[in-house]
A protein has these predicted regions:
Chain B
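Inter-helical junctions in multi-pass inner-membrane proteins, predominant
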Residues: 2-20, 127, 152, 173-178, ...
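Helix-loop-helix "hairpin" substructures at the membrane interface of multi-pass membrane proteins
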Residues: 148-229, 253-258
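Hydrophobic alpha-helical segments within and immediately flanking transmembrane helices
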Residues: 20-28, 41-61, 86, 90, ...
């Protein structure tokens, strides 16, 4: 047994060296047309060797380590606790939610401008993640091209405002409905496909939309994007220093206060907050409606759901369309916040980030998804010096999550009725 | 005559690209055939193969070695070793622990791995694209001097020849060798093969290693053909190769070869007659159409849904 372990450990250590040394140990540098090779820093090479030694030792003593780990008493204090009673839990959850919303309402008036701007972005991601949560978490349809619907929402607003001078409030429902229409049109043929084929087809669709946006230069401006997207107005009041459109008044003049750029940022944040809350409530309601139950039934067992008389296509299509609708919402807000959009913002990586949020938070769990969206957007901002490692950590976190805790950080708990024991 | 020569040129270009797609597609199709998952990180393994080959080529040049066959063979061997180790490690770390769970879980794990590997190379080697020396230059030309000439470069011939050799070796390996027979048995029925004493874990590892080695060959060839590489170029190539695998019928090795060639030709015809920008649209569109109308692909077997 020991000899077998040694052989295996040696093999693993060698593989570690092979996969890390050539890539990390040599740096390719190109000067003009010639490519030269430089040795990496000593610290990197020491790190690679150290990693190999760690792998070797771990594999060598793996049986002992695992054995002693299992003998340790359960350190998790929550492991054996009784699940909270359902009515209590629901009460606690709604108290928490109310507190969160109150906190979010007060937040823009105490935080700095940059922080409020970032919070708007967080809210946009929350909307996106909640929408994708319907598709992936509830209906179990892996959509890797979700960003396409986000792009449809954003570009709808940008193009309508550029060509027809449509304002934010008109564009918001149009963008969302158009995104939903795209979802419907795409979903109709592809939802017959099995899970992993669906993933690839949606991914292809996302790429097609991005390539089209990039190449239809005379309509979308191609890679240069569209700029000058107007800010939302409050009952015809504009937030700029000067009124741009006739018939409008400006916010600071109406209320007789000094002009401040912060008003606009706060206003946008509040819009995003309201929309995010609407999204969360709407989806929460949908989850308890027959259609929401049907999503979950289909996710759990397609054949059983079908034999109970559910229309597979209609159920899947409704999830897909509703998910796309909220992505369109988020897209319109995003376009208005940035004032400028280009296909750069709608790459596959964005879809992957939103998916990562849903997966990390716990597929199907709204609270988990919201917390994960906050964490995933804010953590990289806090740790600026590690920002280049952001995606590396993302990828690793997705893998580790699937290996150790596929249900996510805050797994979804089904609403259920418990039978009371008879006295 | 002009038009015919132009057409033939596009055909040759398409077949060149297509044969490398076929090499990458083998990895997808074999893995899918055995454990029924899409190895999303396969494109990254191909990209790592290309980087290793470039590192080996530059290293040999720095040592003053200029004999072309030696450079090519060393680069090929290095790329294959690193890529196959990577393939083995990826399966071990990211796929084996989640094997047998719900379908989406291995897929998400694979996407995570793909992002991880992309950024691993990005951090180690920078995000800019790096020139890949064209080691094989020159070619044959056909047609009148003063008008359009069809050309076949030696590079293209090398790609054809290498692909042909790899495919022949693979076919012989799958049909004749012990591991190859075990591979076929496992892909027919994993549980039964296990009962009959086949170490299925080893066979699955072997599948990943074989697929990764072929992807590394494609990495070296395409790196030389395109003349530059960057950490993101594995993603699109992987997607194309997957399309090729689905087109031919996923799980079927001859299907992957056929699918690769068809896809390559379709792409180069689009660039030749429409516009190069839309070639990706055409290949993804093709993928969507095939999945809609013939999900089993050209040479695939229909799948029976069991309850």
């Amino acid at each position: 047994m020991a000899a077998h372990n040694l052989k295996h450990a040696l093999f693993c250590a060698i593989v570690t060296l092979i996969i890390s040394y050539p890539i990390l140990g040599f740096n390719l540098a190109s000067e003009g047309t010639t490519v030269t090779l430089e040795g990496a820093k000593t610290s990197t090479i020491v790190g690679v060797l150290l990693a190999a030694v760690v792998v070797f030792l771990f594999q060598l003593f793996r049986d002992n380590l695992m054995g002693s780990l299992r003998q340790l008493p359960a350190v998790n204090p929550l492991a054996n606790r009784k699940p909270m009673e359902q009515s209590k839990r629901l009460k606690l959850e709604s108290t928490l939610l109310t507190l969160m919303i109150i906190g979010a309402l007060v937040w823009p008036f105490i935080a700095s401008r940059g922080a409020v701007d970032l919070s708007t972005l967080v809210l946009i991601y929350i909307m996106l993640a909640l929408g994708l949560n319907v598709v992936v978490g509830l209906a179990g349809l892996l959509d890797l091209g979700y960003v396409a619907f986000y792009a449809v929402g954003a570009y709808t607003f940008a193009l309508l405002s550029q060509y027809y001078g449509v304002s934010f409030w008109f564009a918001l429902p149009i963008g969302a409905l158009l995104a939903a229409l795209f979802g419907l049109v795409l979903g109709f043929p592809v939802l017959r496909l099995r899970g992993d084929y669906l993933a690839i087809v949606t991914l292809g669709f996302g790429e097609i939309i991005r390539i089209l946006l990039n190449n239809m230069t005379n309509l979308t401006g191609g890679p240069n994007g569209i700029g000058g997207i107007p800010d939302p107005t409050l009952f015809g009041m504009e937030f700029g220093r000067r009124v741009k459109e006739e018939g409008n008044t400006s916010f600071h003049e109406t209320f007789g206060i000094a002009y401040s750029g912060e008003h606009k940022v706060i206003f946008l944040y509040l819009i995003a907050l309201v929309l995010a809350v609407i999204t969360a409530i709407a989806i929460r309601r949908l989850m308890r409606m027959p259609v929401g139950r049907a999503w979950e039934a289909l996710r759990e067992d397609e054949i059983a759901a079908k034999s109970l008389g559910l229309n597979r296509t209609a159920v899947k299509l409704s999830a897909f369309t509703i998910g796309a609708f909220f992505a369109g919402f988020a897209g319109t807000v995003f376009a208005s916040k940035q004032g400028f959009i280009s296909p750069e913002s709608f790459v596959f990586l964005e879809s992957a980030i939103i998916l990562a949020i849903v997966v990390l938070g716990g597929m199907g769990s709204q609270m988990g998804v919201i917390l994960a969206a906050i964490a995933v957007t804010i953590l990289p901002e806090l740790a600026r010096e590690f920002s280049e490692y952001r995606m590396l950590i993302f990828g690793a976190a997705m893998v580790l999550m699937m290996v150790w805790r596929p249900q996510g950080l805050l797994p979804m708990r089904r609403i259920h009725i418990e039978l009371k024991k008879q006295e | 005559m002009q038009d015919l020569l132009y057409f033939i040129q596009q055909l040759i270009n398409g077949l060149t690209i297509g044969s490398t797609y076929a090499l990458i597609a083998i990895g997808y199709t074999m893995v899918y055939g055995i454990i029924g998952m899409i190895n999303f990180a396969h494109g990254e393994i191909y990209m790592i193969g290309a980087y290793t080959a470039l590192i080996a080529i530059t290293g040999l040049a720095a040592l003053g070695i200029a004999w072309l066959p030696l450079i090519l063979i060393v680069a090929l061997v290095c790329a294959m070793i690193v890529s196959s180790s990577m393939g083995w490690a990826v399966e071990r770390v990211a796929y084996r622990p989640v094997r047998g769970k719900h379908r989406l879980i291995p897929l998400i794990s694979a996407i995570g791995m793909s992002i991880f590997l992309q950024n691993y190379v990005h951090l180690a080697q920078g995000s800019r694209n790096i020139g890949f020396p064209a080691l094989i230059e020159g070619g044959f030309r056909f047609g009148a001097e003063d008008s359009f000439q069809t050309s076949i470069t030696y590079m293209q011939i090398t790609i054809f020849a290498t692909t042909l050799v790899c495919m022949t070796i693979l076919s012989l390996f799958i049909s004749r060798s012990r591991i190859g027979r075990a591979c076929r048995a496992v892909s027919q029925d994993l549980g039964m093969a296990n009962l009959l004493g086949i170490d299925t874990n080893r066979i699955i590892s072997a599948t990943f290693v074989i697929g990764a080695a072929l992807a590394a060959v494609a990495g070296l060839l395409l790196g030389m053909y395109y003349g530059s590489i960057d950490p993101l170029f594995g993603f699109i190539a992987g997607l194309k190769a997957f399309t090729a695998a689905v087109l031919g019928g996923i799980g079927s090795i001859p299907g992957a070869m056929l699918g690769g060639l068809i896809l390559g030709v379709a792409e180069s015809m689009t660039s030749g007659y429409l516009s190069g920008e839309y070639k990706d649209v055409v290949s993804f569109g093709l993928l969507i159409l095939i999945l809609l109308f013939k999900p089993t692909g050209l040479l695939g077997k229909p799948e029976v849904e069991k309850i």
